[in-house]
Amino acid sequence: MKVRASVKKICRNCKIVRRNGVVRVICSDGRHKQRQG
């Protein structure tokens, strides 16, 4: 999980999801997981 000021899609499998007011990227590639912080 990377914590970044700006989350971006890295590949075409990445999806931007908002959970409890937190922006996240979920992907089939675990290395692409990100959270805005």
Curated annotation (Swiss-Prot):
SUPFAM superfamilies: Ribosomal protein L36. Pfam families: Ribosomal_L36 (PF00444). GO terms for molecular function: structural constituent of ribosome. The keyword Ribonucleoprotein applies. The gene is rpmJ. GO terms for biological process: translation. It comes from the Bacteria. This is Large ribosomal subunit protein bL36. InterPro entries: Ribosomal_bL36, Ribosomal_bL36_sp. Keywords: Ribonucleoprotein, Ribosomal protein. One of its GO terms (cellular component) is ribosome. The keyword Ribosomal protein applies. Belongs to the bacterial ribosomal protein bL36 family. PANTHER family: 50S RIBOSOMAL PROTEIN L36, CHLOROPLASTIC, LARGE RIBOSOMAL SUBUNIT PROTEIN BL36C. PROSITE patterns: RIBOSOMAL_L36.
